[in-house]
């Protein structure tokens, strides 16, 4: 069900995309780091038992064990580069796989702490993986850390680190910082690199264009999402944003049509009913407006907008 958060500016909805993309993001970093680890194993015949056990756990996808091994070593040797990096990578992997945001941020903080310490080593200057993971970790921290996410993702990108999701995460971070022009540029690069862009990428580009008041461009991406997406939730959100564009530009009939399509295809929705009330109020039909607000209130007695309109 849509709520007020669903229609807020894109920068404040950064976690929507993050949670949906968690599994994909994990796959990207796993491939990159495993290749590097394979090289380490080949050139270091004198590898310690601790490293051997950690690498075994990592390559098996047991990030919890690899994280714990690295923690144990760091408790005794807190500045060892290899274990700092592996703790940072493992904690990041665990963080993005969590359902609970509090658990996610706990692991993300651990990842950032270890990777920042690893950056104190000279070896980190040529290790783009650290900046890549650190940038994504800061992106998960939210809008307040978007400047750091941008900083480290750009360092990784300038080091020619091969990760296809850098432009998309840069787009997210620029949007979170309010730099929607740079956000559009980054998202557009991600779009060009992807023959089949995700719903979230299409919605992200659209929302950045909306924030720039370039509604014609936004509508193109929203319509593409509606036409191509197999996901009903993405389609509902695209229609909702499209209705908002129509309403704000005075195309009330087109906005009303989008709201009713949402209701017909997705069932009753308190937020849609409330927005219909707002639409009718703009048209001067206060009777229909109050009727829609009452429906919204009955469906969701906690709906702040409906309660305010009805003086409840």
Q: What is each residue range found by the language model?
A:
Residues 73, 117-118, 155-156, 189-191, ...:
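Canonical positions in the second alpha-helix
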Residues 2-126:
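N-terminal leader/linker segments that initiate helical-solenoid repeat arrays
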Residues 55, 89, 93-96, 136, ...:
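Residue-level recognition of tetratricopeptide repeat
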Residues 59, 93, 97, 140-142, ...:
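Register position in tetratricopeptide repeats
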Residues 47, 81-82, 126-128, 164-165, ...:
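Helix-start (N-cap) detector for alpha-helical repeat units in TPR-like alpha-solenoids
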Residues 76, 121-125, 159, 193-194, ...:
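Structural marker of alpha-solenoid helical repeat scaffolds
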């Amino acid at each position: 069900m849509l709520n007020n958060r669903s229609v807020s500016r894109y920068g404040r909805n950064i976690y929507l995309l993050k949670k949906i993309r968690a599994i994909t993001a994990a796959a990207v970093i796993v491939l990159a780091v495993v290749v590097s680890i394979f090289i380490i194993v080949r050139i270091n015949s004198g590898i310690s038992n601790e490293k051997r056990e950690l690498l075994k756990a990592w390559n098996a996808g047991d990030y919890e064990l690899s994280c714990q091994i690295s923690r144990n070593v760091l408790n005794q040797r807190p500045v060892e580069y290899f274990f700092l990096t592996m703790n940072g990578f493992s904690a990041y992997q665990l963080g993005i796989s969590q359902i609970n945001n509090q658990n996610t941020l706990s692991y993300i903080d651990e990842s950032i702490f270890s990777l920042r310490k690893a950056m104190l080593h000279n070896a980190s200057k040529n290790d783009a993986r650290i900046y890549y993971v650190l940038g994504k970790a800061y992106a998960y921290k939210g809008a307040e850390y978007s400047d750091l996410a941008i900083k480290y993702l750009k360092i990784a990108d300038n080091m020619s680190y091969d990760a296809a999701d850098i432009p998309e995460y840069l787009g997210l971070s620029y949007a979170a910082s309010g730099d929607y022009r740079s956000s559009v540029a980054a998202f557009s690069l991600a779009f060009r690199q992807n023959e089949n862009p995700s719903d979230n990428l299409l919605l992200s580009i659209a929302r950045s264009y909306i924030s720039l008041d370039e509604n014609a461009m936004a509508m193109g991406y929203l319509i593409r999402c509606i036409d191509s997406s197999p996901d009903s939730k993405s389609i509902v959100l695209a229609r909702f944003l499209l209705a908002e564009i129509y309403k704000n530009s005075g195309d009330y009939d087109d906005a009303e049509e989008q709201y009713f399509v949402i209701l017909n295809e997705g069932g009753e929705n308190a937020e849609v009913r409330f927005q219909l009330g707002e639409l009718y109020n703009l048209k001067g039909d206060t009777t229909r407006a109050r009727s829609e607000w009452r429906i919204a209130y009955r469906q969701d007695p906690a709906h702040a907008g409906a309660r305010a309109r009805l003086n409840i």
